[in-house]
Amino acid sequence: MDQTEAAQRWLGIDPGLAIIGWAILDGQPDLSAHLVDYGIIETSKNLSTPERLVEIEQDIHVLLEEFSPQAIAMEMPFFSRQIKAAGGVMQALGVINLVIYREKSIQPVFLHQSSWKCHLGNGKANKAEVAAMVQNFFGLEDLPIDDSVDAIAIALAGLNGVRNDIG
């Protein structure tokens, strides 16, 4: 992309069943990035998995309608020991992927956690370190240390061309 091209809008997603982080960035690869908005989607543990998935579907629909992203980057979770959690997260990931494709015909870029963290400078950074790097990059005074921070970093990595051979 050259400097004369318009900025592209990216949606970054840190998927989960209980909490989904999301962030919207506008920018051009390696030139500029503007943080438009970010937040989390939470589903109640008191709901059944199908009810939580419906809530996720509806909330992702709202994000897509409100922000109209042109590209999407999502973390591809890795599970080594948390097999029970993996099922719910992968179901949520499937619903998110379905809604994105159904409504925007976009195939998300899937990134391993170590890939998007390396883009910030430390592939093993914890959430507080990721928050500090994101806060510094965007010149933010305050930033919550939650899943939205990861989503900001995921969107930034996607915007700047980080890719994995997965998907």
From Swiss-Prot:
Annotated positions binding Mg(2+) 1: 14, 147
Co-factor: note: Binds 2 Mg(2+) ion per subunit.
GO BP of this protein: DNA recombination; DNA repair
Matches recorded under InterPro entries: RNaseH-like_sf, RNaseH_sf, X-over_junc_endoDNase_Mg_BS, X-over_junc_endoDNase_RuvC
UniProt-annotated catalytic positions: 14, 75, 147
Catalytic activity, as annotated: Endonucleolytic cleavage at a junction such as a reciprocal single-stranded crossover between two homologous DNA duplexes (Holliday junction)
A cellular component annotation (GO) from this entry: cytoplasm
GO molecular function, one term: magnesium ion binding
Protein location: Cytoplasm
Positions annotated to bind Mg(2+) 2: 75
Family according to the record: Belongs to the RuvC family.
Protein name stated in the entry: Crossover junction endodeoxyribonuclease RuvC
Annotated organism of origin: Synechocystis sp. (strain ATCC 27184 / PCC 6803 / Kazusa)
